[in-house]
Amino acid sequence: MAQASVQIGTPLLTTRQAEELHKSILAYLASKNLATTAATLRDELDLAEESFDAEKAKKYEGLLEKKWTSVVRLQKKILDLESRNHLLQSEIDNATPSSLSRRTQDPTNWLPKAPPRYVLESHRLPVTCVAFHPVFTSLASGSEDYTIKIWDWELGELERTIKGHTKAVLDVDFGGPRGGTLLASCSSDLTIKLWDPSDEYKNIRTLPGHDHIVSSVRFIPSGAAGAPASGNLLVSASKDNSLKIWDVTTGYCVKTILGHVDWPRAVCPSHDGRYLLSTGSDKSVRLWDLAGGRDAECRLVMFGHENYNLCCAFAPPTAYPHLAKLAGLERAPPPSSSAEFMATGSRDKQIRLWDGRGNCIKVLVGHDNWVRGLVFHPGGKYLLSVADDRTMRCWDLSQEGRCVQTLTGVYEGFVSCIRWAPPVVKDADATAGNGRSEGSSLADPVVAARRRAATVGSVSASVQIRCVVATGSVDGAEGKVRIFAN
């Protein structure tokens, strides 16, 4: 039989991609018992049977169908986005001056309003945590139902469900080294898992090492003095009373931080990655300096809460002018500094604001139950909190921390977590979040961290606040995610 002169494959594919496609087709044909067709294709490709036997073919079974359905989902998303774009364009064309002014509201003063844009339902048990992708419109949520779900917050659609943990998922966070964003999760099953968003959220690594529940996990930003340069570090907090720092490229624990005498329930890094803030069941708030090399130095230990502490957050430099006034300072700290002000929430129903010397500068009272989550407004003027009293409260730091808004009637149960979408950063080094330059205006997460470390004194023209907030809650026996957006 004469050999065909037409090259199989497409010049749009690399050699490796073409090989993977050929193997997927062969595996598909084998699964359908089309042995003759498979043999003909194998002969055309000059692929020896021993180099791609039945055992190796099993790895590729279902891959072709999965890629096909992924294309269908993407086509649907494109159609939905085109439809939404058309509607938004119609709104702009028909906008009155008053409606247009509402749409162009100053983002530094925007606050979440009821009703939420979307109420996302799929989790069978309470939602414990949420996290935004730094580039795309993806949101991850973790739940006591052992799963992580990935949503498109712009469309309000469930994209996929990730399974792997064997107990409740307690925290999630996006971040990682330059050239590729990762998703980290931690669980009551004592493990931390890393997932690759660019490869259908494949579990690429599991980090064992903690001896008890792992309740908090955060990527450590890079690019500032004293911080790791590669952005490949992750910090975790556990009921074994320790904090651990991990290298996500190797999976090794590079540092164990001891000091808490009871469960440190929450940990967060400063915007430049130099400091860590931790708090928990020993009622203490601890500030750690990572600039000393192998050992983390405990710079401050703060007490004041009367019950277990559940959450903590560093204030962004945009909040320094307001918090400096609360602290009685004549001049705000320079924007280039970090760990100047902090906030903590507790089961004592209070929120405490602290300065960098360890002084409590303000106690915010208003919640009627445990305070579960805190987030500072990127513009620096507000602090948002959620609690078991089924409310979200907004505190105006320019008015001595007065509560200026309470969202009630939105939640059916306890509100467990809150996150603000990271800013859109315009940068020449932008990538699509998977290591390939796409000329996008959305920056690599590490580039974004470096840009924030350099320009965080004000809301720079290169940094655009995204007016999007996500919360997780307990609604009856199930969990729900709510999206508030401008």
Swiss-Prot record:
One GO BP: microtubule organizing center organization
Cell division in keyword set: yes
Entry protein name: Nuclear distribution protein nudF-1
InterPro entries recorded: Dynein_regulator_LIS1, G-protein_beta_WD-40_rep, LIS1_N, LisH, PAC1-like_LisH-like_dom, WD40/YVTN_repeat-like_dom_sf, WD40_repeat_CS, WD40_repeat_dom_sf
Family according to the record: Belongs to the WD repeat LIS1/nudF family.
Cellular component per GO, a single term: cytoplasmic microtubule
Quaternary structure annotation from Swiss-Prot or TrEMBL: Self-associates. Interacts with ro-11/nde1 and dynein.
Keyword annotations of the record: Cell cycle, Cell division, Coiled coil, Cytoplasm, Cytoskeleton, Microtubule, Mitosis, Repeat, Transport, WD repeat
Source species: Neurospora crassa (strain ATCC 24698 / 74-OR23-1A / CBS 708.71 / DSM 1257 / FGSC 987)
Role of this protein: Positively regulates the activity of the minus-end directed microtubule motor protein dynein. May enhance dynein-mediated microtubule sliding by targeting dynein to the microtubule plus end. Required for nuclear migration during vegetative growth as well as development. Required for retrograde early endosome (EE) transport from the hyphal tip. Required for localization of dynein to the mitotic spindle poles. Recruits additional proteins to the dynein complex at SPBs.
Entry remark concerning the domains of this protein: Dimerization mediated by the LisH domain may be required to activate dynein.
Gene it is expressed from: nmp-2
Molecular-function annotations in GO: dynein complex binding; microtubule plus-end binding
WD repeat boundaries on the chain: 122-163, 165-205, 209-256, 259-298, 321-364, 366-405, 448-486
One Pfam assignment: WD40
Predominant localisation class: cytoplasm
Superkingdom of origin: Eukaryota
PROSITE patterns, alphabetized: LISH (PS50896), WD_REPEATS_1 (PS00678), WD_REPEATS_2 (PS50082), WD_REPEATS_REGION (PS50294)
Localization (cell): Cytoplasm, Cytoskeleton; Cytoplasm, Cytoskeleton, Spindle pole
Domain LisH intervals: 17-49
